């Protein structure tokens, strides 16, 4: 599973000219699912995301989590996170899971993340052509590559 976590002042996703989801201060998360991803990866990642201390405390030190600031989360499915550009000039997405695997895992990830956050999260629409806008705060951007089910591949 590949995840890009961006600390944001606000973010939104628009589909066919209509705003589907919008958030204020929090995280805008891009998530790419692989064939080998599973529930263990989702559980670990959701716990990690809500406990990441990347928001400033009263002293300007990144010491608060999204739970501490009562922040919001917007999650966007992004199979292109699995692009391989080693050969040629056209990216290969062979590592990205097929929709029959990735859709249920994406939905489970969103459900578990919402539960861990303690409130609803915003989402895009799997497979849709989306326009995503955000103000990256900091900027703070964290790339997380995780395979709990395959410890030797842990990044």
What residues fall within each predicted segment?
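Single conserved hydrophobic/aromatic residue that forms the stacking wall/gate
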Residues: 146-155
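Compact, glycine-rich, soluble single-domain proteins
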Residues: 19-70, 80-111, 116
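Positively charged, low-complexity, intrinsically disordered RNA-binding extensions
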Residues: 93-145
């Amino acid at each position: 599973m590949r995840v890009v976590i961006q600390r944001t002042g606000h973010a939104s996703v628009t589909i066919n000219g209509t705003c589907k989801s919008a958030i204020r201060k929090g995280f805008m998360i891009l998530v790419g699912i692989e064939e080998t991803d599973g529930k263990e990866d989702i559980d670990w990642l959701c716990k990690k995301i809500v406990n990441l201390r990347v928001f400033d405390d009263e002293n300007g030190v990144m010491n608060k989590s999204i739970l501490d600031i009562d922040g919001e989360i917007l999650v966007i499915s992004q199979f292109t996170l699995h692009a391989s550009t080693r050969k040629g000039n056209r990216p290969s997405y062979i590592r990205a899971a097929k929709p029959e695997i990735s859709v249920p895992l994406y939905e489970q990830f969103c459900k578990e993340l919402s539960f861990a956050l303690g409130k609803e999260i915003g989402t895009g629409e799997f497979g849709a052509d989306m326009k995503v806008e955000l103000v990256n705060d900091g900027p703070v951007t964290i790339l997380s590559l995780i395979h709990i089910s395959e410890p030797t591949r842990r990044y």
